[in-house]
């Protein structure tokens, strides 16, 4: 594979410049998502920040000093604008304004998540309230098809490599979709 050595050199120079200017005596500004965020839920679970109290109830031990953001875009902008900030977003939301943290020496990448070396990952789920309309089922079938998985992959998320081709059930209608701001 070809490499963009100009971009690599610029990234190395930027990293060197940032490292030289970074004052290790400064406090790190912790950013977190709002209560109810699926990204926050996954993060606190994966990192052991969520524990159970004596009664078995889940307790979120995110620091009280965390700056709370209400969306992925606000998280990215906030981290990008503060060299002492740290936060979290889904892999597909990463852009060149922030740098992902390596976990146990593994970079955040589709390949490393698929091979298990980057262990901080979560699935996205489709949830419905009971039975769905034929149009909604057709939409779900599309998402789970090779064509739908290609859209997922093309947008930076991890799709399935073994999905079958989409076969419409011929339904028409309106489907209401809501959920994570990560997708």
Q: Language model features by range: what are they?
A:
Residues 1-183:
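Exported/periplasmic ABC-transporter solute-binding proteins
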